[in-house]
């Protein structure tokens, strides 16, 4: 016996049955889907349906709620203002407001309805006196601005 004379035993490799390929194929016409209805159509899946068992969405408890009155802030660090000042997008002489930050590209314009809060992340040698008129400030940010000789309006 040589390598080119090897072959599988009869019935060792069974071809899989191709579904919905003619009536004579044994799985033709409806292709095991039954007759009519949502589940017989192509591309249809019932979202969240798990075959009759209680879906995970119903098994898990409801938790929490979305408070309507929470204030949503755009967060700006002192460092972001420092970079904008260095690039010339903001001026030290001007009062820095929400609108000026949007023009300078520090705050995203899409979130124009949100309030602006200043946080204290800045370089160690921050000493620029700034005049700011924003919606909120962290306590550390207030300290940094006041130590540098700035004003919060």
Swiss-Prot record:
Subunit structure: Part of the 50S ribosomal subunit.
Keywords recorded for this protein, A-Z: Ribonucleoprotein, Ribosomal protein, RNA-binding, rRNA-binding
Any one cellular-component term (Gene Ontology): large ribosomal subunit
Name the record gives this protein: Large ribosomal subunit protein uL15
Region (Disordered): 21-40
Role, per record: Binds to the 23S rRNA.
Gene source species: Rickettsia canadensis (strain McKiel)
Gene Ontology biological process terms from the UniProt entry: translation
Lineage, opening ranks: Bacteria, Pseudomonadati, Pseudomonadota, Alphaproteobacteria, Rickettsiales
């Amino acid at each position: 016996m040589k390598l080119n004379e090897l072959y599988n035993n009869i019935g060792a490799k069974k071809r899989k049955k191709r579904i919905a390929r003619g009536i004579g194929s044994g799985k033709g016409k409806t292709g095991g889907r039954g007759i009519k209805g949502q589940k017989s159509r192509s591309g249809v899946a019932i979202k969240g349906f798990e075959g009759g068992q209680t879906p995970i969405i119903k098994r898990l408890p409801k938790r929490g709620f979305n408070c309507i009155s929470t204030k949503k802030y755009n967060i700006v660090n002192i460092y972001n203002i420092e970079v904008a000042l260095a690039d010339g997008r903001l001026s030290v002489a001007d009062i820095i407001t929400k609108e000026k930050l949007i023009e300078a590209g520090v705050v995203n314009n899409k979130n124009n309805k949100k309030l602006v809060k200043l946080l204290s992340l800045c370089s160690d040698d921050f000493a620029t006196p700034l005049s700011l008129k924003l919606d909120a400030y962290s306590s550390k940010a207030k300290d940094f601005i006041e130590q540098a000789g700035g004003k919060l309006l």
